[in-house]
């Protein structure tokens, strides 16, 4: 068996920053540090931070007074921010800057009294946070659609003042179909100047397509609740290549690889490289040859830390 590795794969700049915010808060202020929602959707990462003293909660009413709370990379609604301010909680915001960009677009549409359509998955924390940026007091509304059927059923009040934004971790192919449906139904709809699907999502989807084209099977390292990891698995399967989403080597079954000559491995944007290395080590034990990394696309984007958590130069 030959192993091929997607490039890029694994952590993106937003995930790196979010995890580092929790780690530095623990270093500077000591445990416990409260985190609203899993800071990123990866079991290994969350378990490690929990062992260091991070306490993960779903709502701020689970957070005591006079503590530090961190908002996850997925972002939060304006209501959550106001609740934290009202209670005087010290907040560090780990929202990915590319999610914040979408939030600012929604706030602008809301302020101007324009309506907005969000393309995304209902119930995902990023979607809840983005929907929660819209203030309907100016007479507009925000609508959520997931697919072309939702667009067909959608009725808006202001088709002449309508915009769309997207969740940052969607499938580019699926999203383009929804956008086409929106434009066909609402010819005056306007989109953002720049695609809302983030660079890391796009790069990893391009890489898994290349991987699936060269392999008999694809393994996607990522947790089941990771949106971008699920999209990678779906993309590989759509290209006709069997694919499995795994948290790590412990999820693999030896029988999966009977008759497989080329195994492709990628990782979602919230999955650390150590898990990929564990998968490779297990495959090598089962007889796989040394891995080959595909050329891919270099990523050198970084996002700054909150001022109080920046490491001072010696």
Swiss-Prot record:
Entry binding sites for dimethylallyl diphosphate: 41, 74, 124, 226-228, 270
Alphabetical list of Gene3D superfamilies matching this protein: 3.40.50.11270, 4-hydroxy-3-methylbut-2-enyl diphosphate reductase, catalytic domain
Comment on bound cofactor: Binds 1 [4Fe-4S] cluster per subunit.
UniProt GO molecular function: 4 iron, 4 sulfur cluster binding; 4-hydroxy-3-methylbut-2-enyl diphosphate reductase activity; metal ion binding
Catalytic activity from the UniProt record: isopentenyl diphosphate + 2 oxidized [2Fe-2S]-[ferredoxin] + H2O = (2E)-4-hydroxy-3-methylbut-2-enyl diphosphate + 2 reduced [2Fe-2S]-[ferredoxin] + 2 H(+); dimethylallyl diphosphate + 2 oxidized [2Fe-2S]-[ferredoxin] + H2O = (2E)-4-hydroxy-3-methylbut-2-enyl diphosphate + 2 reduced [2Fe-2S]-[ferredoxin] + 2 H(+)
BP GO terms, sorted: dimethylallyl diphosphate biosynthetic process; isopentenyl diphosphate biosynthetic process, methylerythritol 4-phosphate pathway; terpenoid biosynthetic process
InterPro entries tied to this protein: LytB/IspH (IPR003451)
Pfam family, one: LYTB
Enzyme Commission identifier(s): 1.17.7.4
Residues the entry annotates as binding [4Fe-4S] cluster: 12, 96, 198
UniProt cofactor(s): [4Fe-4S] cluster
GO CC term, one of those recorded: cytosol
Disulfide pairings: none
HAMAP family recorded: IspH
Family membership noted in the UniProt record: Belongs to the IspH family.
Name this polypeptide is given: 4-hydroxy-3-methylbut-2-enyl diphosphate reductase
Recorded name of the encoding gene: ispH
